Design a protein with these regions (language model features):
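Short loop/turn motifs at secondary-structure junctions
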Residues: 33-34, 143, 175
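Chitinase-like catalytic core of GlcNAc-active glycosidases
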Residues: 1-23
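A structural signal for short, well-ordered beta-strand segments and their strand-loop junctions
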Residues: 39, 68, 143, 178-181
Length: 249
């Protein structure tokens, strides 16, 4: 309760009038615009009892709707608390899925650190080995970067082979892969001195752009190598039930 930042006041979701308005607005939005999926920002900061009400209202009206919450926390037990899980605890979340930061940090460690008891590729193994706590880990959203963190191509030192290996992990892992725009050509950027450096325009979207990265001719050889790798794996994933719904071994 309070202000998330000085520019972002919280809404009092425990107030019945506010809660009803938010639920009605969510239902209206799906109906009006034909939305088939919700990414719920900063899920952990919400009133979780209210979120269960809102989630249920949306699922009751739209059974095929997909919903997942941003849960920027550390550790699989903490992350799984905010989604449907197998814990025998008082609060039970009914949220379908979460943004899987634990898998992201596992891939990051695997690509940037030597093997150790708790670091390197072992961190990825340890995260995935705890999938049994989720009701359905296949619904979690897996990713390499987003608008709040460093672009992954920069994280791996702009090493094309490491980047392609990371993409291979992403597109052959359990869960629903999410790509942040620009990742398909290896856009770079860190969040320092501010987040604007990972939110640059994709070249070619504006008339004043000197190059058009939407076309093969506008991309460099390295960018096309990354593009082709993603396209090949993504098309394979679309046609492979073993990858999309198979058991994680």
């Amino acid at each position: 309760d309070g202000w998330f930042t000085k520019q972002m006041p919280d809404l009092n979701q425990s107030n019945p009038f506010v809660a009803n308005f938010l639920i009605q607005h969510a239902l209206w939005t799906v109906e009006e615009f034909g939305i088939d999926g919700w990414r719920i920002d900063t899920y952990a900061y919400n009133d979780l009892k209210f979120m269960n009400r809102c989630n249920k209202a949306l699922e009751d009206e739209y059974p095929k709707l997909t919903m997942f919450g941003e849960t920027w926390v550390h550790g699989v037990p903490n992350q799984s608390y905010f989604t449907q899980n197998n814990y025998n605890i008082q609060y039970k979340s009914n949220l379908q899925a979460v943004t899987d930061f634990q898998t992201l940090w596992g891939i990051t460690d695997a690509m940037t650190k030597d093997f150790g008891w708790t670091e390197g590729v072992n961190k990825l193994y340890t995260a995935l080995a705890q999938d049994f706590v989720y009701k359905d880990p296949m619904r979690n959203v897996i990713f390499l970067d987003n608008h709040d963190i460093a672009r992954f191509f920069s994280v791996v030192g702009e090493d094309v082979e490491k980047y392609k290996s990371s993409i291979s992990w992403l597109l052959t892992s359990r869960g629903i892969p999410q790509f942040y725009y620009g990742g398909e050509i290896g856009m770079t950027g860190f969040t320092s001195p501010n987040d604007g450096y990972v939110r640059q325009d994709f070249p070619g979207g504006w008339t004043e752009d000197h190059v058009n990265k939407f076309t093969r001719a506008g991309r460099t050889e390295k960018e096309n190598e990354i593009w082709d790798h993603i396209a090949k794996l993504a098309n394979f994933r679309k046609t492979s039930s073993a990858v999309t719904t198979g058991k994680m071994m």
